[in-house]
Amino acid sequence: MRSSHKSFDFENSLKRIDSILNDSTSYEESDDIPDIDDLTFNNGKYVNCAAIFIDLRGSTDLIKTLGKLSKSLARLYRAYISEMVAIVNSFKTCKEINIVGDCVSAMFAGDIEGAESPVIEALQASSMANAMMNVLNVKYKKKWKDFVELKAGIGVAYGRALVIKAGFSGSGIKDLVYMGDVVNKASKMCGLAYKEYTSHAICVTKEVYENAGKYIANEEKKLTYQDFLTEKNHNTFGSVYVGNFHRVYINNWAEENK
């Protein structure tokens, strides 16, 4: 959000706090993530949604090696972010995309079953993002001969969130905020992929796994996404599911152009 300078008034601040804390608005259920302009600073909607987080691994080392070459680093990040955004943005149930540093996250929602359900489309985005990292590494290595391969951890969660509009009323500074475990869990799953589970790019919650058997991901072998996920028992999060599945045609390009 861009800043829009406005003098701070302490008395107005106290009034705003009291107004927010004493608000009695009830929150309704919704099949989809509302548009920010359809919300006020006093209401909100409960929505079932899937969240995906895609985060680079080894970016600290990357800054150390390419940090002095700021133009090179900028090109690398732009290429990575542009393609992760392009992937999640290609799905109908993707309703919001955020970029923070080298992490791209997105929210998927909609009362849709089958191939276009939020969970299935978030998993499809995961498979494409995983394969796209191989394509990017091919491109990076051709550009910088001594380039060390990059990896991205991908986390997906599904659950109920309260969506509210938050910001500073009257300033134009506003954003949607998702309250609930789904965003936090997706971030945590992302934090496990290619870190604690060093050989797995994708980590999802139990709720995602339970909804992953409703779509044939591999037509030839009649496999669902459940067939590409393996259960792990995590000390903090209980049952989580990890995998390395990827979109075949994207990955094939990377293999053929190494």
Swiss-Prot record:
Q: Which residues bind Mn(2+) 1?
A: D55, D102
Q: Which residues bind a ribonucleoside 5'-triphosphate?
A: F53
Say where the protein is mainly found. cytoplasm
Which of UniProt's keywords are assigned here? Antiviral defense, Cytoplasm, Lyase, Manganese, Metal-binding, Nucleotide-binding
Q: Name one GO biological process term.
A: defense response to virus
Pfam families linked to this entry: Guanylate_cyc
Give its E.C. classification number: 4.6.1.26
Where along the chain is Mn(2+) 2 bound? D55, D102
Has UniProt tagged this entry with the keyword Manganese? yes
Kindly provide the name given to this protein in its UniProt entry.
Answer: Uridylate cyclase
Top EC category: lyase
Source organism (scientific name)? Gulbenkiania mobilis
A GO cellular component term found in this entry reads:
cytoplasm
